[in-house]
Amino acid sequence: MADTSSRTDVSTDGDTDHRDLGSDRGHMHAAASDSSDRSKDKLDQKTLRRLAQNREAARKSRLRKKAYVQQLENSRLKLTQLEQELQRARQQGVFISSSGDQAHSTGGNGALAFDAEHSRWLEEKNRQMNELRSALNAHAGDTELRIIVDGVMAHYEELFRIKSNAAKNDVFHLLSGMWKTPAERCFLWLGGFRSSELLKLLANQLEPMTERQVMGINSLQQTSQQAEDALSQGMESLQQSLADTLSSGTLGSSSSDNVASYMGQMAMAMGQLGTLEGFIRQADNLRLQTLQQMLRVLTTRQSARALLAIHDYSSRLRALSSLWLARPRE
């Protein structure tokens, strides 16, 4: 009986232990389920935020891509235009005028129109210079000389107006000097003569001058030299900037990214080249202002002699070019 009671007690204790263990397991399962639900809620919220961020990033990416495609299209159009102009220039080439003393670029209608206008301008200038020379040789009075001198200066203003219009159409034609003779091109600076160099050449042609006139011409020469140096430095900076633009990026690759980069470089380079027109205009303004200020320092008769000296110097350069082109060749 004692053994039976003992077994019964053990069995009862075992059942109680199993019930307690089952209850604990139930609580643990419920807790785990609650924790899993909370984790799932947090995960869902993170996923929703991530999806929202992804959608926003995708929207911004589409906008950037649209803007980039538009930029590429604009660059492609500009590049196509450049290629067409280059092809026309190659087809038309370069020809020598019938006089044999001047090479002309035929890179477009703008260049041809300028060459024709400059030729007419030169003919009128020759006529004016002959008139001025005759007046000086005939010892004409200051009033008559002043009328002719003013006409010559107005004619120079017309030249710079013609050049300004030509620069808008083909600035490279002006910079290359193909509208000048070969000898003149040796001394070309930003599409024309250096004012400071002309003043040096005129120093011996205008004697005798008063001390005040000498000081005025020297001061004008220094001022012109400083302005020329500033423009030359600006051109050097432009050339360096252009070289940096064209050399940036990966070379030799034909991937779509590099093609797009190439087109972007060309568009940027075209924008930089647009400043060349400004350099030509500033250089011509300096030339005109130097001539005007020079005439203010000189007397009327000295002004007439100075304009003749400039004309004769240019004429000799053109004559030298003709002789050079006509020289015997072995």
Curated annotation (Swiss-Prot):
SMART domains: BRLZ. Residues 46-66 are annotated as: Basic motif. Residues 15-27, 35-45 have a biased composition (Basic and acidic residues). It is found in: Nucleus. Expressed predominantly in roots and flowers. One of its GO terms (molecular function) is transcription cis-regulatory region binding. Its main location: nucleus. Residues 1-45 are annotated as: Disordered. It holds the Pfam family DOG1. This is Transcription factor TGA6. It comes from Arabidopsis thaliana. The gene is TGA6.
